């Protein structure tokens, strides 16, 4: 696979990929918010031969961190390096902006759901560590696990 992180993402890229991932992104209102975020924040597309394979939206969290607000990869391309390449871009952006950390929020382990078990395993494999699980962010029916990775300093 000749993968390149070549361009900024747009809302249409976001909606196209999220539509293929209903196990993770099945709430239309949330997907619309992700598409809006792709337009206003730093958003990147991984592509091959002009086809969008995955995308990532980054949000500056202030003094110390860049947050991976969204990471989505076409389901047929999981475990092929697309997500890892996007996380590497997030780390590069954090270093460029002198941010020592990259964070990500995902569904916490206290409410088991197999797709998110794979998500957490991916984030741990690329270097994130669990920091804290909270119910105050997304509600008790959707516990939020905050994960963190040091990229510099």
Residue ranges and their predicted role:
Residues 120-122, 150:
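Short, hinge-like loop/turn segments at secondary-structure boundaries
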Residues 94-115:
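Conserved GNAT acetyl-CoA-binding A-motif
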Residues 5-70, 74, 87-88, 93, ...:
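Acetyl-CoA-dependent GNAT
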Residues 116-119, 133-143:
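Short glycine/proline-centered loop/turn elements that form peptide/ligand docking sites
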